[in-house]
């Protein structure tokens, strides 16, 4: 009986999402930065391009909050999409990135996680004790516009693929990777690439923080 009740609560949480705001908003509204609107069906995300801006409903701790990508301008952002709450591989990624928050902080980077689940589903998941305390926002792309803009929406299932983007302080995508649903991503590799990008130098195969970079002779 308890299992059925818990399942009913979970299904209700997923179903009753009110949707999310997925639109360009931020400093551009004050004329300081350009605004990159998310158009239906548009795929704008590629290395060297401006990261599509968004404002999404999210859960921070156990409170609802609207999160705007533009609020993170001036810092690196680790933005990763995942297929869904209450799954199997996804919680290992959510908790894995959370365990490395201090390391990302040392690299002046903030972490944001996005799925197409409702904010109510996120809250129910966080309250289920399956994740423990998570120190970064879980965002709800209920309309799927953000996942579509970043080119990671599986149109057949309506869920995001495991896409990860490193966005620099100027709001430009510097790295992206997309995994199949069955394979989780590597926190260690994400940190390695992040630090490598921050050197702004040539980093050879398997380069690790503290190792020598390549400096062509003039």
Regions found by a protein language model. Give the residues of each.
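Chalcogenol-based redox active-site neighborhoods
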Residues: 23-218
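Bacterial N-terminal signal peptides that target proteins for export
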Residues: 1-8
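Bacterial N-terminal signal peptides
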Residues: 8-19
């Amino acid at each position: 009986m308890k299992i059925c009740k818990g399942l009913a609560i979970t299904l209700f949480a997923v179903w009753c999402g009110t949707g999310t705001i997925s639109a360009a908003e931020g400093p551009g509204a004050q004329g300081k930065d350009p605004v990159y609107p998310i158009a239906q069906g548009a795929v704008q995300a590629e290395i060297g391009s401006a990261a599509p801006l968004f404002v999404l409903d999210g859960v921070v701790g156990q409170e609802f909050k609207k999160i705007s990508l533009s609020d993170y301008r001036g810092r690196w952002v680790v933005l990763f999409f995942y297929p869904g709450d209450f799954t199997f591989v996804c919680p290992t990624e959510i908790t894995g990135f959370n365990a490395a928050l201090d390391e990302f902080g040392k690299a002046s980077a903030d972490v944001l996680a996005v799925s197409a689940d409702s904010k109510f589903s996120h809250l129910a998941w966080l309250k289920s004790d399956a994740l423990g305390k998570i120190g970064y926002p879980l965002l709800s792309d209920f309309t799927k516009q953000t996942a579509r803009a970043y080119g990671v929406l599986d149109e057949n299932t309506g869920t995001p693929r495991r896409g990860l983007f490193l966005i620099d302080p100027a709001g430009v995508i510097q790295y992206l990777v997309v995994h199949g649903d069955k394979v989780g991503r590597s926190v260690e590799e994400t940190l390695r690439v992040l630090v490598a990008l921050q050197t702004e130098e040539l980093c050879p195969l398997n380069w690790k923080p503290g190792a020598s970079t390549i400096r062509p002779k003039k």
